[in-house]
């Protein structure tokens, strides 16, 4: 309907029941007034002023609105609602223009707010289908700047400033609110298209009809000024729901990325990328606007944040997402033996999968073991809705969870599972890790803990943060704590040369800032350090032990032998002597990590480097004098039956808290995935 150079301009002005002017639309208040005037660009003639009052759903006007507009709520009772008012507008414009073949018009407003922040958001909430003419418009402020580059900046420009620049007389205050603005805009437009300016209105602003999904490469350069973070989203919301919340603003292709937590579930946050900084700034004005009954917080974010969530480099994912305008559904809880044919049969003919087998993407670990997740493409919304109705239906003996998904979620899940092990395990031969004389006393408080570090902090940043106390750090005494993904957790432990220096460092450096973040510093001992790494808490109020340090009761059928209990040497090397019941005195010349051993942290997300040890294994050659430790094969087999289908390794290990199990062959899969086997030695250990 809109040509590049329209024949007519329709000047449009809206009024809401709340804030107006520069804050128009920022408070989610409804439209109560529409004013418009038609301008013939060819004849340079201005039509009559038209006005329609609109009845909002909530007939409450703010005091500011009453004072500025002089509109009373009683006068709105008989007014039409927004949908009928828009129909009157469309019909009136069509009759006045007598639109025929080749006749075109375009809306013109004072700034972006009337279209992007008022009409589109409210119409979206009320499920009103806006006419096509509302998807393109001219921003008179921008057009004025193109014609008169020497005028004020766009943000400072308004109708009165433009009128003053052109030398217009100020309108009488007898004009009702909005009428003087519409009259002035008509005069400004006629002046711009006349001598000496002879300006032509072309290339109007566009409003996206719908959100387009797509992929984003990790190598892509993204402007930080186009990204926002939305918080408080309903867990079942999709990228389409986010696009609807920001209706009227143009989101970049594939620019809505839902964030997942450590368990792969949505955490109520999303990162959104807009086409420009202007649209990002308008999005920030929707802070605490509502999605259903929930208010959504909107904050600035960075391009790096967006790439961490939405970026990907997998060719397999790119090929899977190459089909545009597809609806993505995520399957969770699949049997590990599930095939593409079984998935196709699960959905059936009512919701055919796009491309058959090519429309199914199974998620696997780096060694190609299935995770139980898959993504499926559907050609239209109808097929996707039919598919979602199969939520929690059975495939084989397992019920399948179905969720609407996004391209960014596909990237996140694939990135999470396809990453190689981030904490590499040591390989043969057995190597000495730490000479015994350098193991620090566990009760001496010669360590400090740094909490709240920036995730990008390096050892050099920590040394600079400690200042004069950096000279008191022991060799290899800085230990960065990582989370399960191998990324910095914001914590660090540092071994000082003496308890006095550790005390002074904690006193003087506590809550100093590092890269705009304040960092907490606590004095602690090596034993307290281990407590924290196993899930305890350490602050200035003292130390709270982790769950594994709470008193453990012996099994009722077990009695301790009279002699001292002995556990395997390789297992004993992993624990402090004070943690073992009746430990036998062990005097190894060095501490070892046996070949193939796996270290499990049952109660915490940390993967620490042991006190005094290097930050990675394998840098130190094996001593020729060190002999291999013989394997300890005694043990008992326990069969677990009736496990929940979603039970994982962590739940099984927590169930056996207090027992020492053999980590290298601890879990053995069986045919029934709700069962597992655990082997552990006969010794009873409180860990």
UniProtKB/Swiss-Prot annotation:
PROSITE patterns: RRM. CDD domains: RRM1_ESRP1, RRM2_ESRP1, RRM3_ESRP1_ESRP2. GO terms for molecular function: mRNA binding. Keywords: mRNA processing, mRNA splicing, Nucleus, Repeat, RNA-binding. It comes from the Eukaryota. Residues 226-303, 327-407, 446-526 form the RRM domain. The keyword Repeat applies. One of its GO terms (cellular component) is nucleus. It is found in: Nucleus. GO terms for biological process: mRNA processing; regulation of RNA splicing; RNA splicing. Belongs to the ESRP family. mRNA splicing factor that regulates the formation of epithelial cell-specific isoforms. Specifically regulates the expression of FGFR2-IIIb, an epithelial cell-specific isoform of fgfr2. Acts by directly binding specific sequences in mRNAs. Binds the GU-rich sequence motifs in the ISE/ISS-3, a cis-element regulatory region present in the mRNA of fgfr2. This is Epithelial splicing regulatory protein 1. It comes from Xenopus tropicalis. The gene is esrp1.
């Amino acid at each position: 309907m809109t040509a590049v150079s329209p024949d007519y301009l329709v000047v449009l002005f809206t009024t809401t029941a709340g804030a107006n002017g520069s804050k128009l639309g920022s408070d989610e208040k409804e439209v109560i007034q529409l004013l418009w005037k038609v301008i013939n660009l060819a004849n340079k003639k201005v039509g009559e002023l038209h006005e329609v009052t609109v009845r909002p759903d909530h007939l409450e006007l703010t005091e500011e609105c009453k004072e500025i507009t002089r509109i009373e709520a009683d006068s709105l009772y008989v007014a039409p609602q927004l949908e009928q008012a828009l129909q009157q507008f469309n019909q009136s414009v069509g009759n006045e223009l007598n639109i025929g073949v080749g006749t075109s018009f375009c809306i013109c407003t004072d700034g972006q707010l009337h279209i992007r922040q008022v009409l589109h958001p409210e119409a979206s909430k009320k499920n009103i289908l806006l006419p096509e003419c509302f998807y393109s418009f001219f921003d008179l402020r921008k057009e004025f700047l193109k014609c008169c580059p020497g005028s004020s900046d766009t943000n400072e420009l308004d109708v009165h400033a433009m009128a003053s620049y052109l030398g217009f007389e100020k309108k009488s205050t007898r004009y009702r609110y909005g009428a003087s603005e519409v009259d002035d805009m008509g005069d400004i437009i006629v002046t711009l298209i006349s001598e000496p300016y002879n300006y032509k209105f072309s290339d109007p602003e566009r409003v996206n009809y719908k959100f387009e999904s797509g992929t984003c490469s990790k190598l892509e350069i993204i402007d930080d000024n186009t990204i926002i973070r939305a918080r408080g989203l309903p867990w079942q919301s999709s990228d389409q729901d986010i696009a609807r919340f920001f209706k009227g603003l143009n989101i970049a292709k594939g620019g809505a990325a839902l964030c997942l937590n450590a368990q792969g579930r949505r955490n109520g946050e999303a990162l959104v990328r807009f086409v420009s900084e202007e649209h990002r700034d308008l999005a920030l004005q929707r802070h605490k606007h509502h999605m259903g009954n929930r208010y959504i917080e909107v904050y600035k974010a960075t391009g790096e944040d967006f790439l961490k969530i939405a970026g990907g480099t997998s060719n397999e994912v790119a090929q899977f997402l190459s089909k545009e305008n597809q609806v993505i559904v995520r399957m969770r809880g699949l049997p590990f033996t599930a095939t593409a044919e079984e998935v196709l049969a699960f959905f059936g003919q009512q919701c055919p999968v796009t491309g058959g087998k090519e429309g199914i993407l199974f998620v696997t670990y780096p060694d190609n073991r299935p995770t139980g997740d898959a993504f499926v493409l559907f050609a239209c919304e109808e097929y996707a809705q039919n598919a979602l109705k199969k939520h929690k239906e059975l495939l084989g003996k397992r019920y399948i969870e179905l969720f609407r998904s996004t391209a960014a979620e596909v990237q996140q899940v694939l990135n999470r599972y396809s990453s190689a092990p981030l904490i590499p395990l040591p390989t043969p031969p057995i190597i000495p890790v730490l000479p015994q004389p350098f193991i620090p006393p566990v009760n001496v408080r010669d360590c400090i803990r740094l909490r709240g570090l920036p995730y990008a902090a390096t050892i050099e940043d920590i040394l600079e943060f400690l200042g004069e106390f950096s000279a008191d750090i022991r060799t290899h005494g800085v230990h960065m704590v990582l989370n399960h993904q191998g990324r910095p957790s914001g914590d660090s432990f540092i071994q000082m040369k003496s308890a006095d220096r550790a005390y002074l460092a904690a006193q003087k450096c506590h809550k100093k800032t590092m890269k705009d973040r304040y960092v907490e510093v606590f004095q602690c001992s090596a034993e307290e350090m281990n407590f924290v790494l196993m899930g305890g808490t350490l602050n200035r109020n003292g130390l709270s032990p982790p769950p594994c340090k709470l008193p453990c009761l012996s099994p009722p059928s077990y009695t301790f032998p009279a002699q001292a209990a002995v556990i395997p040497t390789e297992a004993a090397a992993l624990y402090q002597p004070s943690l073992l019941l009746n430990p036998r005195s062990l005097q190894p010349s060095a501490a070892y990590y046996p070949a193939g051993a796996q270290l499990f942290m049952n109660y915490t997300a940390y993967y620490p480097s042991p006190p005094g040890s290097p930050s990675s294994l394998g840098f130190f050659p094996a001593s020729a004098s060190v002999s291999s430790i013989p394997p300890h094969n005694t043990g008992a087999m326990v069969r677990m039956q009736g496990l929940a289908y979603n039970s994982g390794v962590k739940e099984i290990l927590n169930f056996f808290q207090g027992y020492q199990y053999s980590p290298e062959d601890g879990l053995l899969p069986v045919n029934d995935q709700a069962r597992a086997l655990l082997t552990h030695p006969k010794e009873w250990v409180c860990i």
